[in-house]
């Protein structure tokens, strides 16, 4: 059995502090929502980052996805989390390309700074426009027991948008599914390795291995050309299956990749599960939609195979 662990509130890193705190749907907001006494989390960004009604949401998700004739089996994926009008095409293509199992472990950055540094919500469900999506409590318990870095903490997920926006895409290809939400703060490289390898041990023991998902946008508020150059450096490290290189280049080149920690963890886990290659499924920037190339956010979709 695991012991309930708590951690002090985390601070935003210097990169996040350089991002203007405005509610732009092509980037990352911090908004309120609630978790009631039955541990049902209310949506934080329904009607903002994605349509708030089931009918309109289904229409939007179908616009950004397709029924691929052949699917690839991925150990892990990286997908963006902005408003669907900006990053839906990238996220949708990744979810369209890979096989979607009935369970996923989703790692997202903690934009709000609330809660533990590696926070798992292990019970209850997340309310979405179509109904509730249940958390896989058994898998969550096994993950908590496997890594002392993880803490049971629902508060970190209360206002976090970057995991919530992935659920409609999962539902598009798997009507009934469970998931484990994990919000990550500022872990060291060694902690990313330890956590990724612990996750891989648990996932590798499952008869139905979960899909490991890292939620991340790329460069924030850079001119389009600079964003593409910086993002290219990070993408190159991911395509080379080099989590250490990814972690370091994001810092050395000051790439404002908000989900570098989730991506590093999932890359370590995918390697431990036997990944031998990676594929860049799609890349774009917000400028491809808005036409504004002066300040863009980058979106990359990758699969680790």
Segments (PLM) and residue ranges:
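Active-site histidine-anchored catalytic micro-motif
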Residues: 40-268, 272-275, 281-290
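Short, basic/aromatic-enriched C-terminal tail that caps enzymatic domains
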Residues: 281, 286-305
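Short, positively charged and aromatic/hydrophobic N-terminal segments
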Residues: 9, 34-36
């Amino acid at each position: 059995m695991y012991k309930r662990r708590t951690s002090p509130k985390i601070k935003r890193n210097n990169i996040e502090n350089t991002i203007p705190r405005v509610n732009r749907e092509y980037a990352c907001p911090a908004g309120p929502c609630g978790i009631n006494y039955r541990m049902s989390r209310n949506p934080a960004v329904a009607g903002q980052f994605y349509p708030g009604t089931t009918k309109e949401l289904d229409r939007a998700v179908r616009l950004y996805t397709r029924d691929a004739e052949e699917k690839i089996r991925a150990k892990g994926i990286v997908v963006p989390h902005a408003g669907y009008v900006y990053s839906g095409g990238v996220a949708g293509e990744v979810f369209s390309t890979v096989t979607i199992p009935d369970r996923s472990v989703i790692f997202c950055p903690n934009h709000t700074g609330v809660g533990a540094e590696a926070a798992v919500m292990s019970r209850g469900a997340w309310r979405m426009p179509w109904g509730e999506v249940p958390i896989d409590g058994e898998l969550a318990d096994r993950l908590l027991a496997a890594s002392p870095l993880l803490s049971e903490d629902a508060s970190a997920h209360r206002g976090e948008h970057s995991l919530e926006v992935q659920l409609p895409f999962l539902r598009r290809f798997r009507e009934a599914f469970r998931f484990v939400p994990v919000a990550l703060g500022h872990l060291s490289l060694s902690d990313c390795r330890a956590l990724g390898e612990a996750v891989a041990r648990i996932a590798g023991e499952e008869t139905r291995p979960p899909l490991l998902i890292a939620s991340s946008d790329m460069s924030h508020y850079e001119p389009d050309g600079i964003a593409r150059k910086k993002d290219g450096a990070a993408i190159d490290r991911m395509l080379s299956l080099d989590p250490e290189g990814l972690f370091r280049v994001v810092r050395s080149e000051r790439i404002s990749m908000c989900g570098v920690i989730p991506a590093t963890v999932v890359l370590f886990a995918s390697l431990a599960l036997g990944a031998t290659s990676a594929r860049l499924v799609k890349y774009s920037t917000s400028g491809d939609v808005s036409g504004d190339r002066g300040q863009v956010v980058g979106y990359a979709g990758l699969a680790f195979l």
